[in-house]
Amino acid sequence: ACLVGSEMCIRDRWKTNPDYPNGWFTYDAIAPELIEYVKENGYNYIELMPICEHPCDSSWGYQNTGYFSPTSRYGTAQQLMRLIDLCHQAGVGVLLDFVPVHFALDDYGLARFDGTNLYEYPHPDVGVSEWGSCNFMHSRGEVRSFLQSSAWFWLEKFHFDGLRMDAISRILYWQGDENRGVNRDGEAFLRVMNAGLKQRCPGCMLIAEDSTQYPGVTHPVETGGLGFDYKWDMGWMNDTLDFFRTPPEKRSKHYHKLTFSMLYFPRETYLLPLSHDENVHGKATILQKMYGDYEDKFPQARALYLYMMMHPG
């Protein structure tokens, strides 16, 4: 069956509700509307953007502090379990956006946990990420065990169907910079974690968000790959959206943006994303990205989604 998923940020979709004690909708409250929306729009999976406990109500949750606790903003762990169970009963799979790259700097988190750089690199050059957070030191066995245990915890205890791992280029390359070379400890960490998760939960889905040319992301660990099931095709997303922004009379010179992905798609097993990264910070919605007047945008958006559904992969 075709995998058709929708990213879900509970905070952005349901905002706040003054009728609830802490001002947020609960997992129980959103379940009926969420499932109805997903089914009506033909999705068979949802991907919950990070729900590990995190500081800052306005954030998307990518800088975690609690790797074994769902955020209490939306209710209890048991309520989240019920939400996932109801999705499964409706035939909808649930994936979790998992962040094994970096964590929040806040004092009540993992930074300098025992007064030393226990989880993070001691050198600022590689210890602090581009987002101002702490990079995990994947060379330490204790750190690897912590992250592997967290990943398994969400699959085993909450019955998530899989994990989408965020920004793995920052694990594979020092600070995500291919010119600085491969981080062999990070590379080994991903292989060991993915192999272990597949051994304990053979049916789980492991998805990599990676925009680099690192080879073998979706190849088996046994043959030297990283062991992911799918890799986001970020190049397809950027090229395709650029094409649809182009005035129609100039598109004949830009057809390569539609066809280039056909040259490399056999190398990996790709998922085609149209992700939150493309409408954050004023980048506009998919409809707004289409060229032309308001009414002209709709047929182009339909063509975009049709191309996405029919693309090989």
Question: What feature does the model see in each segment?
Answer:
Residues 2, 76, 186:
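Short, conserved glycine- and acidic-residue-centered signature motifs
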Residues 2-10:
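Short, small-residue-biased leader/transition segments that mark boundaries at the very start
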Residues 6-7, 64, 269:
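Extracellular structured ligand-interaction cores
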